[in-house]
Amino acid sequence: MSKTRMEKLKTLKTIAETLNQGHDIKATLDEVLKELLSLTNLQSGWIFLIEEDGSYTLAADAYLPPALSRKEKVLMCEGECYCLTKFNNGGLRKAANIMNCKRIESAENLHCFDTEGITHHATVPLEDGDRRFGLLNVAAAGKTMFDEEELHLLESVAFQIGTAIQRMRLSEYQQKNALLMERNRLAQELHDSVNQMLFSVSLTAKAAKTLTKDENLQQMIDFIQNLSQDALAEMKALIWQLRPGGLEKGLAEAIKSYGALIGLKIIFTQKGCPVLTDEQEHMLWRVVQEALNNCKKHAGTDTAYVSLTASLCHAELDIIDHGAGFRYEAHAGLPSLGIKGMKERAEKAGAKFWIESALGTGTKLSIRLPLKSRKGGAV
C-alpha cells in the first residue's frame, strides 16, 4: 500500500473517531476542522451550515486570516459568495476548486487587513444521502488548485461530517422531544394537584372568614387567603414556563401575555425583523420570562420595558426596569442562580449576555445574538 494511501486512511480514521465521539454539532465541527487542517497541512478552513431557504450559519472556522476574522467575522457571516450561490442553485454536488474567494476579494478591497496569502479555496458539500447540510471550505496561502487526490480525500471527510451531523441532529431532536414531554407531564401534574389544592385553600379561607367575628382571627384568615392567592399566581407562572407552548402568536405577544399573567405592564418596542430559529426564539423567551419574574419579585415596580433590535447579523434584546436595582460589580460574579441560569442559556445559544444595575437606579439585562445570514445579502 502506498504511503499516500496510508496517510489518507489515517486521516479518515482520525476524523471518524472524533465524529463518532461528538454530541454537540458546533464543538465537534470545530475540533474536526482543526484536525483536518493539521493532517492535510492546509492553513485555514470554515464550515457553513445552510438551511433550505438559503440562509446560512458560520458553524465552525479555524485559523482564519485577519481579513476574515475582523469585526467578529462579519465578512463570513453576511451576504452571498460564489460557493453558496452554486450550492443553493444545486450546481455543487461534489468537491470543487473555486477560482477565487469573493469574501477574500471583499477583504482585499478594504486595503487594511492581511489575507495571509489566501486567494482561493476548495469547497465540498456536506451531505448524507439526499440530505444536504452545508459546505466545507479549506484553503492555504498561494494554493490555487487542489488535485484530484486531495479533492477525493475532502469528499470522503465531508461525507463523514454529513453523516455525523445527521446523527447528532436526530439525537438532539429525540432529547428535546423527551424533555418537552417531561415538562408537559410535570406541568399537567402541577395543574391537576398543587394548583387545585391552592385554589381549595383560598376558597376555604374565604368561607372561613364568614364564620367568625373575631378580628384577629379574620386578619389571620385574610393572610392565609392572600398567601394562597400569591402562591396560586406563582404556580400559574411556573406551569406557563414548563409548558412548551406560548410562542404560537410570536415572541412579542408571548412577552405581553406573560407580563399580564404575572401582573406586569410590558412596554415592548421592536426595530427590524430578526429571522430567528426555533431554538433562538425559545432561548429569548425563557430568558425574558425569568427576567420578568425577577422584576415582579424584587424590583418594586409594575412596569418593565422590553426592546428587540435586529440588524443583518445580530439581534439585541434589552429588558429594563426602573425599580430598586441592586449592587452589582461584574468582577464579583453574578448575584443569583436565576441570573446565572439566564447567562448560561444565552451563551449556550451563542449569544453574549450582560447585566447592569445599581441600587435605586433599576436593572438592565441585555442579550446580543448572532443571526443566520439571509440569502441575497451583499458581501
Swiss-Prot record:
It catalyses: ATP + protein L-histidine = ADP + protein N-phospho-L-histidine. PANTHER family: NITRATE/NITRITE SENSOR PROTEIN NARX-RELATED, SENSOR HISTIDINE KINASE YHCY. The gene is yhcY. This is Sensor histidine kinase YhcY. GO terms for cellular component: plasma membrane. SMART domains: GAF (SM00065), HATPase_c (SM00387). The keyword Secreted does not apply. GO terms for molecular function: ATP binding; phosphorelay sensor kinase activity; protein dimerization activity; protein kinase activity. Residues 185-373 form the Histidine kinase domain. Member of the two-component regulatory system YhcY/YhcZ. Probably activates YhcZ by phosphorylation. Keywords: ATP-binding, Kinase, Nucleotide-binding, Phosphoprotein, Transferase, Two-component regulatory system. Gene3D superfamilies: 1.20.5.1930, 3.30.450.40, Histidine kinase-like ATPase, C-terminal domain. It holds the Pfam family HATPase_c. It comes from Bacillus subtilis (strain 168). CDD domains: HATPase_UhpB-NarQ-NarX-like. The modification Phosphohistidine is found at residue 191. Its EC number is 2.7.13.3.
